[in-house]
Amino acid sequence: MYQGHMQGKGSRAADKAVAMVMKEIPREESAEEKPLLTMTSQLVNEQQESRPLLSPSIDDFLCETKSEAIAKPVTSNTAVLTTGLDLLDLSEPVSQTQTKAKKSESSSKSSSLKKKADGSDLISADAEQRAQALRGPETSSLDLDIQTQLEKWDDVKFHGDRTSKGHLMAERKSCSSRAGSKELLWSSEHRSQPELSTGKSALNSESASELELVAPAQARLTKEHRWGSALLSRNHSLEEEFERAKAAVESDTEFWDKMQAEWEEMARRNWISENQEAQNQVTVSASEKGYYFHTENPFKDWPGAFEEGLKRLKEGDLPVTILFMEAAILQDPGNAEAWQFLGITQAENENEQAAIVALQRCLELQPNNLKALMALAVSYTNTSHQQDACEALKNWIKQNPKYKYLVKNKKGSPGLTRRMSKSPVDSSVLEGVKDLYLEAAHQNGDMIDPDLQTGLGVLFHLSGEFNRAIDAFNAALTVRPEDYSLWNRLGATLANGDRSEEAVEAYTRALEIQPGFIRSRYNLGISCINLGAYREAVSNFLTALSLQRKSRNQQQVPHPAISGNIWAALRIALSLMDQPELFQAANLGDLDVLLRAFNLDP
């Protein structure tokens, strides 16, 4: 039934981790196989893989590129692959037409210069080279191994020393247009005076051509600025989306922190404030001490409410038993036995606070009530009130006719008196009470007192000696094998001793004897969580809540007597199952939705 126990403890920490689901983005290439589109696809994918899936997919970028039929400018988010790559010529064929027009215009100007320069071959070559220099800014080179300007100048000088003037002109034509300014200087040094005057007119024509190129360059800069603004806007929106996702993850982390705090609070189960003055005041009423009666109890005028309550307790109907006991107390506030059974039933119904108040009131009315003293010691232990638990167990010895002489004999011992008079909780106080119980057990010899063994088991539980506590409870069970409360205490000790598998067996035995034992059902769910059987844990918690509600509905009780820590444990189990929609139902207290989800009868 609890097949998940092998990985239980190891999986609890892993279940609390916040996982982010990532999705691989498919890479697509342009159908036209343009270099620009291919490069843009690669760059966007590289950028996409560097952060979570929070930005638009690569398809969005490709669609925009195809629709605009232009290339995206190189921005800070885009890597430059080569220094000689001009993206504009790859996507705008219009610029080639403009270049040809400017080339023809420059050629016509060059021909006019030839007529004015007496047909000199050198001037013709120089004018043609200047026309190439004008076309240089509008032309891109895909060559990655371009010579530097200084190397080209050295090449020109080297060939000039060894070859004729005609060979010099041919070599200069093979150089890149990027050396235009230096070539103009070289021409001016080797020309005659008429050639220089002709060169001035050529420079004037070059200035005019540059002015004609300013407008297209500014238009291109404006378009690039617009593209850059669009990309910056996109990046800004992506940053906002990332911040929203980050906030969602942080809220998810807060959820797990809240679950951890709730788990620790449930483990402490320390909801009772220590009020020593209220404990010593016998004349204080029950309502003033914190017990809250059901305001609309349908049995408040029921004749023989106490006897009817005992009958319902044997049947295992704990919520209705509580109502009958409250009715009996309202009819007779001094009925100590009714307070006793009310406290014991509240503890079995997983309401420790009300149990402690009722048992305290019982002992105020009847200080020698041994059952109330033992039940109060167990409730104090469950709420981590060790000093109060030790005092209750000591009072059990003092009020017991069989063992009270042990306390009188120990009064002559200064060491015991000093240890028992200390108010702070320390090991000496616990050891002093434990010595009393061990001596009482030794006095009994082979005879086993189940109540004494129960008290000894509680003391060993308080000191963390779980194996010895288990032995004490097992000894008590040899005398009372049908005592479901003893089976439950044995299961709790086994669970605290890291023996959850055996604890499940003890709880199961307690529920076989008393199916309506809600505390044992709750403890069984906690052991299932420790074993990693989260679904079984949820089933047990829902069964306990359903039992509480069923009794309330049958008797038409308007105010539910449902334990809050059962709901807290249920939320923890649902969170470990990774069921957010069911966890939300638990937060809303929607028991019907949860029962249907786990196929349980309402």
Swiss-Prot record:
Q: Name one GO molecular function term.
A: peroxisome targeting sequence binding
Membrane topology according to the record: Peripheral membrane protein
The species this protein belongs to is Rattus norvegicus (Rat)
**Which Gene Ontology cellular component terms are annotated?**
cell tip; cytoplasm; cytosol; dendrite; intracellular cyclic nucleotide activated cation channel complex; perinuclear region of cytoplasm; peroxisomal membrane; receptor complex
Q: Which SUPFAM superfamilies match?
A: TPR-like
The name of this protein is PEX5-related protein
Q: What does this protein do?
A: Accessory subunit of hyperpolarization-activated cyclic nucleotide-gated (HCN) channels, regulating their cell-surface expression and cyclic nucleotide dependence.
* Protein family membership: Belongs to the peroxisomal targeting signal receptor family.
